[in-house]
């Protein structure tokens, strides 16, 4: 029986099908490494839309979307870093906190939009040239038809709350 187990383990290891190869990376380790790399890029190249896109898309890859049931409790940036799990507002806060941690010099806002599918949180970033860009907090693309009929409920930053007129 021992020899059969050894043969199976050997085959799995040789073929690359060993479960150890499928273990997900620790998002905390990946995140710390990414922060260091982004800091180097900011120092070398400065801020630009491609770097902001890279940072936000990397945050989405590190985050695991988990729909909350019952009361909707928002995680802080530091709470999110404990397990990298949350729903749309937690992931938006994570992206916001990441850009703040990196010293992003332009305005950042969290925005709640009302859409046909329900309320949704996104990150708004003032780009280096002054225009605003919305970053979705889930990997599922927003339908343009839904965006067209959506409306902002509220948005805010560290200092102010903005209501639509």
Set out the residue ranges of the language-model regions.
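A structural boundary/capping signal
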Residues: 16-165
